[in-house]
Protein backbone atom coordinates (compact mmCIF):
# COMPACT_ATOMS: atom_id res chain seq x y z
CA UNK A 1 0.00 0.00 0.00
CA UNK A 2 1.24 3.46 -0.88
CA UNK A 3 0.41 6.40 1.36
CA UNK A 4 0.27 9.92 -0.05
CA UNK A 5 0.45 12.82 2.34
CA UNK A 6 -1.18 16.17 1.53
CA UNK A 7 -2.25 19.12 3.63
CA UNK A 8 -5.99 19.79 3.71
CA UNK A 9 -8.36 22.27 5.29
CA UNK A 10 -10.88 19.62 6.34
CA UNK A 11 -10.80 15.89 7.08
CA UNK A 12 -13.76 14.92 4.86
CA UNK A 13 -11.81 13.61 1.87
CA UNK A 14 -14.94 11.78 0.69
CA UNK A 15 -16.36 15.19 -0.16
CA UNK A 16 -13.31 17.04 -1.52
CA UNK A 17 -11.20 14.17 -2.80
CA UNK A 18 -11.19 12.68 -6.29
CA UNK A 19 -14.06 10.65 -7.66
CA UNK A 20 -12.69 7.72 -9.63
CA UNK A 21 -14.32 6.54 -12.84
CA UNK A 22 -13.72 3.40 -14.87
CA UNK A 23 -14.30 3.01 -18.59
CA UNK A 24 -16.65 0.06 -19.11
CA UNK A 25 -14.94 -1.20 -22.26
CA UNK A 26 -11.25 -0.47 -21.69
CA UNK A 27 -11.16 -0.79 -17.90
CA UNK A 28 -9.06 2.39 -17.73
CA UNK A 29 -9.44 4.28 -14.44
CA UNK A 30 -9.36 8.09 -14.29
CA UNK A 31 -10.08 10.86 -11.80
CA UNK A 32 -12.84 13.44 -11.93
CA UNK A 33 -11.97 16.78 -10.36
CA UNK A 34 -14.92 18.96 -9.34
CA UNK A 35 -14.86 22.37 -7.69
CA UNK A 36 -15.30 22.26 -3.91
CA UNK A 37 -16.49 25.16 -1.74
CA UNK A 38 -16.79 23.52 1.70
CA UNK A 39 -20.49 22.72 1.65
CA UNK A 40 -21.72 25.92 0.12
CA UNK A 41 -19.09 28.18 1.68
CA UNK A 42 -19.84 27.19 5.28
CA UNK A 43 -16.27 26.45 6.34
CA UNK A 44 -13.57 28.61 4.72
CA UNK A 45 -10.86 28.24 3.64
CA UNK A 46 -11.06 25.30 1.23
CA UNK A 47 -8.16 25.94 -1.13
CA UNK A 48 -6.11 22.98 0.09
CA UNK A 49 -9.13 20.66 -0.15
CA UNK A 50 -9.92 21.82 -3.68
CA UNK A 51 -6.37 20.92 -4.78
CA UNK A 52 -6.50 17.27 -3.66
CA UNK A 53 -7.95 15.67 -6.84
CA UNK A 54 -5.26 17.29 -9.00
CA UNK A 55 -2.52 16.17 -6.61
CA UNK A 56 -3.96 12.64 -6.50
CA UNK A 57 -4.04 12.42 -10.30
CA UNK A 58 -0.42 13.55 -10.50
CA UNK A 59 0.75 11.16 -7.78
CA UNK A 60 -1.13 8.21 -9.30
CA UNK A 61 -0.25 9.23 -12.88
CA UNK A 62 -3.91 9.09 -13.86
CA UNK A 63 -5.87 11.04 -16.42
CA UNK A 64 -7.94 13.80 -14.80
CA UNK A 65 -11.22 15.24 -16.06
CA UNK A 66 -12.11 18.66 -14.64
CA UNK A 67 -15.44 20.36 -14.09
CA UNK A 68 -16.34 23.88 -12.99
CA UNK A 69 -19.40 22.49 -11.18
CA UNK A 70 -19.30 22.46 -7.39
CA UNK A 71 -19.86 18.95 -6.07
CA UNK A 72 -19.16 17.07 -2.87
CA UNK A 73 -18.52 13.35 -3.27
CA UNK A 74 -21.07 12.62 -0.54
CA UNK A 75 -23.79 14.41 -2.52
CA UNK A 76 -24.09 11.58 -5.03
CA UNK A 77 -24.43 7.82 -4.99
CA UNK A 78 -24.09 5.62 -8.06
CA UNK A 79 -24.65 1.94 -8.68
CA UNK A 80 -21.87 1.65 -11.26
CA UNK A 81 -24.42 0.63 -13.87
CA UNK A 82 -25.62 4.02 -15.03
CA UNK A 83 -27.89 5.28 -12.24
CA UNK A 84 -27.06 8.15 -9.88
CA UNK A 85 -29.00 9.31 -6.80
CA UNK A 86 -28.80 12.87 -5.47
CA UNK A 87 -30.83 15.66 -3.86
CA UNK A 88 -32.17 18.93 -5.18
CA UNK A 89 -31.48 20.53 -1.79
CA UNK A 90 -27.73 20.20 -2.33
CA UNK A 91 -27.01 20.11 -6.06
CA UNK A 92 -29.43 22.90 -6.97
CA UNK A 93 -28.72 25.02 -3.90
CA UNK A 94 -27.79 28.65 -4.70
CA UNK A 95 -24.71 28.30 -2.45
CA UNK A 96 -23.26 25.94 -5.07
CA UNK A 97 -24.19 28.18 -8.03
CA UNK A 98 -22.95 31.70 -7.29
CA UNK A 99 -26.08 32.70 -5.36
CA UNK A 100 -28.56 31.61 -8.04
CA UNK A 101 -30.57 28.38 -7.98
CA UNK A 102 -28.93 25.63 -10.00
CA UNK A 103 -30.37 24.64 -13.35
CA UNK A 104 -31.40 20.98 -13.12
CA UNK A 105 -30.90 20.30 -16.84
CA UNK A 106 -27.37 21.77 -16.77
CA UNK A 107 -26.44 19.84 -13.63
CA UNK A 108 -27.74 16.61 -15.16
CA UNK A 109 -25.81 17.23 -18.37
CA UNK A 110 -22.56 17.71 -16.45
CA UNK A 111 -23.09 14.67 -14.21
CA UNK A 112 -23.80 12.51 -17.25
CA UNK A 113 -20.79 13.83 -19.17
CA UNK A 114 -18.35 13.52 -16.28
CA UNK A 115 -19.55 10.27 -14.72
CA UNK A 116 -21.06 8.40 -17.64
CA UNK A 117 -24.41 7.90 -15.92
CA UNK A 118 -27.61 7.58 -17.91
CA UNK A 119 -30.32 7.99 -15.28
CA UNK A 120 -30.46 10.47 -12.40
CA UNK A 121 -32.91 10.01 -9.55
CA UNK A 122 -33.60 13.28 -7.72
CA UNK A 123 -34.86 13.50 -4.15
CA UNK A 124 -36.11 16.83 -2.80
CA UNK A 125 -33.85 16.71 0.27
CA UNK A 126 -31.64 14.35 2.21
CA UNK A 127 -31.10 13.72 5.90
CA UNK A 128 -31.65 16.72 8.18
CA UNK A 129 -28.32 18.24 9.25
CA UNK A 130 -26.27 16.49 6.54
CA UNK A 131 -24.73 19.21 4.36
CA UNK A 132 -24.05 16.80 1.50
PLM regions with names:
Residues 1-132:
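The feature marks the mature, well-folded catalytic cores of soluble enzymes
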Amino acid sequence: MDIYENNTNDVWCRDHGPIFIKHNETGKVAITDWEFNAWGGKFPPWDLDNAIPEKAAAALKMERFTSKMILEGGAIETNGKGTLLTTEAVLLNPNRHGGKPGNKAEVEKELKAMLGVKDIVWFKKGIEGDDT
